[in-house]
Structure formats: structure tokens, C-alpha cells
Amino acid sequence: MNPLIQSLTEGQLRTDIPAFRPGDTVRVHAKVVEGTRERIQIFEGVVIARKGAGISETYTVRKISNGIGVERTFPIHTPRVDKIEVVRYGKVRRAKLYYLRALQGKAARIKEIRR
């Protein structure tokens, strides 16, 4: 990577991010601005992908809300995310879990591993 770009992005990298992988269930505390107020919105779901590297790394979280699948993509190093909690560690053999989009109910479950 270009040393100039690397030196600019070093100060913006967050160090309070827990180690999580695709298949893990996470609880993301995102800051949401509504008018003049700012509040914390919790989004809990399964991590189905992690993409990129460095300052531009992102992850996608999927949950089922009222029978409808909802996915949100968050940058890892954004200040808009207050904190990330790992709720459960999942055992998967893929880096991208896009096949979960086609599964429903108990078929969409992921086996849990103890850490």
C-alpha cells in the first residue's frame, strides 16, 4: 500500500473491535440520527460476509424481522457504530454465507461452537 495513504488511515483504525468471523451472531450498536436527536439502535444477526481490508473493510449482518430477511452492511472502522458484541460463535466452512438467503426456518440455523 502507498505509504502516504497508510499513514493517513492509521489514525482512523479502531482498536476496540472484537474478533468475529462469518457465521458468528453479533449485536451491533449503531448510532442513528433522527432529526436533531441521535440514538443507539441495536441490530442483531448473523455475519454472512466480511470484505475488504484496512480502513475500507466491511461486514454484512443478516437477521429475520417479522418473517422478512433484513441485511445491513457496516464499515468496521466507522464511528457510527458504538460497539460490536459477539453473542454466539458459529461453525461454518465458507467465507461468504449468501446461501442463507435461500433457506428458511430451521434450515437456516448455524451450528454453535464453544470458545
Swiss-Prot record:
One Gene Ontology cellular component: cytosolic large ribosomal subunit
One function term, GO molecular function aspect: structural constituent of ribosome
Domain of life: Bacteria
Keyword Lipoprotein: no
Electron transport in keyword set: no
Gene3D superfamilies, alphabetized: 2.30.30.790
GO biological process entries: translation
Keywords for this protein: Ribonucleoprotein, Ribosomal protein
InterPro entries recorded: Ribosomal_bL19, Ribosomal_bL19_CS, Ribosomal_bL19_sf, Translation_prot_SH3-like_sf
Function in brief: This protein is located at the 30S-50S ribosomal subunit interface and may play a role in the structure and function of the aminoacyl-tRNA binding site.
Family assignment from sequence similarity: Belongs to the bacterial ribosomal protein bL19 family.
Protein name as it appears in the record: Large ribosomal subunit protein bL19
Native species: Streptococcus sanguinis (strain SK36)
Gene: rplS
